[in-house]
Structure formats: C-alpha cells, structure tokens
C-alpha cells in the first residue's frame, strides 16, 4: 500500500522552491514546531525562521531554510509562502557565521537605544541557516 501524500508548494518572493507530493512536513510555526501529514486539519499560521523538513513521495527527505512567512494547510494541500527559502547548497555558511557573530556582539554590547528584537531575529536567522548546513553535512535531520 502506497503512503498517503499531500500536495506541497513552497514558494519565496524570488521563485518556486518545491512543488510535489509529500507524506510529512515539519516547520517552525508561531507557537512551536509543527508536523503536518495528509488530511491535517485546516490551519493558517506564521512561520518563524528555521529549518523545514519534508519527506517526498519516494521516501527521500529534503531540508530547507525558511526565514519566515506563512503556512496554509488544507486537507489535500499545503502552501508555504516564505520570505526567503534556501536549500542547504544555496546557504553561504561563512556569511551566516559572520551574521551570527555580529548579532551576538551587538547583543553583548547593547546600548540604551539598542534594537534588541532586530538583533535576536538576526541571530535566530543565522543560527537556523547554520543548523540546515550542519544537518546536510552530517546527513541528519534532527
């Protein structure tokens, strides 16, 4: 018996990242991690910066970095509208490390008119990119 699947579309402002059938999707929603399977209840939520992992119809897994966006789930279709979506191959690891270091330094040296929220968002984005790269390098998904 074939595994049940659902249509997944992941698009960013620049292009379509993925269009196909999946048996599972994992993303970071506004309230925490979400695991979506076929026939999931309808849902609309914000996506936080982080890793998205999905299992394709052939059983292979793919991991992406999402900088944020919206997730719409219907029983037969899932749509991810990402601000930025990158495959691990497209992530500049050196730039992500530099962004992480800049954000950590900015937080450590915060002044009175420091934008803490912007610095923590930048830190979260760089850490999420590095996590995707690390997962691919180690060939793991958690």
UniProtKB/Swiss-Prot annotation:
It is a peripheral membrane protein. It comes from the Bacteria. Keywords: ATP synthesis, Cell inner membrane, Cell membrane, CF(1), Hydrogen ion transport, Ion transport, Membrane, Transport. Signal peptide: none annotated. GO terms for cellular component: plasma membrane; proton-transporting ATP synthase complex. InterPro entries: ATP_F1_dsu/esu_C_sf, ATP_synth_F1_dsu/esu, ATP_synth_F1_dsu/esu_N, ATP_synth_F1_esu_C, ATPsynth_dsu/esu_N. Its main location: membrane. One of its GO terms (molecular function) is proton-transporting ATP synthase activity, rotational mechanism. It is found in: Cell inner membrane. It holds the Pfam family ATP-synt_DE_N. PANTHER family: ATP SYNTHASE DELTA/EPSILON CHAIN, ATP SYNTHASE EPSILON CHAIN, CHLOROPLASTIC. NCBIfam families: ATP_synt_epsi (TIGR01216), PRK00571.1-4 (NF001847). F-type ATPases have 2 components, CF(1) - the catalytic core - and CF(0) - the membrane proton channel. CF(1) has five subunits: alpha(3), beta(3), gamma(1), delta(1), epsilon(1). CF(0) has three main subunits: a, b and c. Produces ATP from ADP in the presence of a proton gradient across the membrane. Belongs to the ATPase epsilon chain family. This is ATP synthase epsilon chain. It comes from Shewanella frigidimarina (strain NCIMB 400).
């Amino acid at each position: 018996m074939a595994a049940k699947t659902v249509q997944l579309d992941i698009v960013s402002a620049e292009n379509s990242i993925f269009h196909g059938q999946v048996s599972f999707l994992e993303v970071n929603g506004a309230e925490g991690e979400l695991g979506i399977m076929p026939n999931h209840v309808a849902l609309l939520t914000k996506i936080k910066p982080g890793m998205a992992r999905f299992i394709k119809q052939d059983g292979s897994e793919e991991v992406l970095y999402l900088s944020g966006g919206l997730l719409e789930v219907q029983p037969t279709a899932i749509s991810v509208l990402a601000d930025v979506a990158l495959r691990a191959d497209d992530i500049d690891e050196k730039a992500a490390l530099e962004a992480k270091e800049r954000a950590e330094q900015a937080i450590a040296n915060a002044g009175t008119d420091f934008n803490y929220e912007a610095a923590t968002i930048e830190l979260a984005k760089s850490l999420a990119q590095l996590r995707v790269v690390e997962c691919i390098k180690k060939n793991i998904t958690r």
